[in-house]
Design a protein with these regions (language model features):
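A short beta-strand motif characteristic of beta-propeller blades
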Residues: 44-50, 97-103, 153-159, 203-209, ...
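Short, conserved, GDST-rich strand-edge loop motifs in beta-rich repeat architectures
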Residues: 4-26, 70-83
Length: 373
């Protein structure tokens, strides 16, 4: 069976004010689709799905028949809040067909996830600090929200932590618990998931607390499910956690920096991902403009930094690792480029392939493995 890999890139299409106060002038037209050359790592433009407003994060369902995109906005249909859009994925060419859109009931939705049973979509609203759950119909369309949770509180940083800022949602492999890093609260909140009703309830141990001022952003699990890697935006660290799937609780193993010891400039973290092999973890630094590379101890889950690779651009907000684990694509938000690196399977180190693809304000990278014959 022949296959090909398509790459879907979310962009900012309109001006947006971030939590830092910075206003970014979005230059994208919507969702960009490319074909990955599985030998060279080069990207061939396929199409632009125009008219999608600020699709800053994307998620496929498990069948890859449907794609969901947040619309990172502060108002929707005249009310405070953003929205999430559903698309059908054409199986032969990978074209997207708009299905419908629903409000997320919070401002600046920045992350979307589909649960393992493809029955619900989970959205984190960054600016207002909330989580929204939406049922998915059999035809891929979204129904009105089945649950909504508003976070409360603040952190020690008056500029960045004056209120709650939910930044992402991750589920465990058993589909029993949902985890929400909240940058404003310095907490990884834990919810029990009722997959039938699409409801979330605080766990018996409702959160894991990180160092004050750390600002947790994203959580990535090891393929074994035994360890989690929590990236902290504000203090540029990774918290390495052991996970108990029975209770939905975490214990800290250690904390590692994402920046070189001699770096003295300003930088914040963005994304964290585990290689499909489970042997390496990667984290992006915005300011240092690099990818930190770590080797995973397969016995303990602990990390050892093996180096940093410049992303050849500014502000790597996101990156993607292709399903084979051979290539990593870094999205440089402020210099409008997608840069391809080859992953060394033995060391985890990154080597530029020379492929630099122009993409206006790219902020999310997702892959679709498509059968061609």
């Amino acid at each position: 069976m022949k296959t090909e890999t398509l790459v879907y890139v979310g962009t900012y299409t309109e001006p947006i004010r971030f939590g830092t106060g910075k206003i970014l002038q979005g230059k994208g037209e919507g969702i960009y689709v490319y074909r990955l050359d599985e030998t060279s790592g080069a990207l061939e433009p396929v199409r632009v799905v125009a008219g999608v407003v600020n699709p800053s994060y994307l998620a496929f369902d498990s069948t890859q028949r449907f794609l969901y995109a947040v619309n990172e906005l502060k108002s929707y249909e005249g009310k405070p809040g953003g929205s999430v859009s559903a698309f059908g994925v054409e199986p032969k060419a990978g074209d997207l067909t708009f299905l419908n859109k629903q409000p997320t009931h919070g401002t600046d939705p920045c992350h979307v996830l589909v649960n393992k049973k493809d029955s619900h979509v989970f959205v984190a609203n960054f600016m207002s600090g909330s989580v929204c759950v939406l049922p998915v119909r059999e035809d891929g369309c979204l129904e009105a929200a089945s649950d909504f949770l508003q976070h409360h509180g603040s952190g020690i940083d008056p500029a960045r932590q004056a209120g709650p800022h939910a930044h992402s949602v991750t589920l465990d492999a058993a589909n029993r618990f949902a985890f929400v890093p909240d940058l404003g609260l310095d907490k990884l909140l834990v919810y029990r998931l009722d997959p039938r009703r699409g409801m979330l309830e605080p766990n018996a141990v409702p959160w894991f607390k990180v160092k004050p001022g750390a600002g947790p952003r994203h959580l990535a699990f090891h393929p074994s499910g035994k360890w989690g890697y929590l990236i902290n935006e504000l203090d540029s660290t990774l918290t390495v956690l052991s996970y108990d799937g029975r209770s939905g609780t975490f214990e800290e193993l250690h904390v590692v920096p994402t920046l070189p010891e001699d770096f003295r400039g300003e930088s914040t973290c963005a994304d964290v991902q585990v290689a499909p092999s489970g042997r390496f973890v990667y984290a992006s630094n915005r300011g240092h403009d690099s990818l930190a590379i770590y080797k995973v101890d397969q016995r303990t889950g602990r990390l050892t930094c093996v180096g940093h690779e410049p992303t050849q651009g500014k502000t790597p907000r996101s990156f993607g690792i292709d399903p084979t684990g051979r290539f990593l694509l870094a999205a440089n938000q402020d210099t409008d480029s997608l840069v391809t690196f080859r992953i060394d399977s033995r060391s985890g180190r990154l080597r530029p392939t020379g492929a630099v693809t122009p993409v206006p304000t790219p902020v999310c990278v997702k892959f679709l493995l498509r059968k061609t014959g």
